[in-house]
């Protein structure tokens, strides 16, 4: 896979603390590692993305504690990172469904 540009919008915006963006990046990276292991059915892929999304949700308090939050800019940056990953692995799940557990 070509190099993934993780969360460019969040890294470029000083509203988002880089150490917290790194935590989201790790959540996404772990999901990519899962996808690289082989072919999975749609249910397994959805379950992994649900797990990733719940882990990102769990970071919300840390964002608040650092005068930030997971909001529209974060949502867009996360989606812009994930959409090329879906295309690369030929995953045909709508991004809204894929991130159905999100609270941001």
Residue ranges of predicted features:
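Generic structural signal for well-ordered, non-transmembrane alpha-helical segments
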Residues: 25, 29, 50-57, 76, ...
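Surface-exposed polar/charged interaction patches
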Residues: 13, 34-38, 59-62, 84, ...
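Residue-level recognition of alpha-helical structural elements
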Residues: 20, 38-45, 67, 71-74
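Mature extracytoplasmic domains of secretory-pathway proteins
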Residues: 28, 33-60
């Amino acid at each position: 896979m070509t190099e993934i540009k993780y969360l460019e919008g969040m890294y470029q915006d000083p509203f988002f603390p880089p150490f917290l963006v790194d935590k989201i990046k790790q959540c996404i990276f772990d999901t990519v590692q899962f996808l690289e292991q082989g072919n999975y059915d749609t249910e397994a892929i959805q379950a992994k993305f649900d797990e990733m999304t719940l882990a990102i949700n769990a970071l919300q308090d840390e964002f608040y504690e650092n005068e930030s939050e997971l909001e529209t800019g974060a949502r867009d940056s996360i989606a812009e990172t994930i959409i090329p990953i879906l295309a690369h692995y030929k995953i045909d799940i709508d991004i809204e469904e894929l991130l159905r557990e999100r609270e941001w």
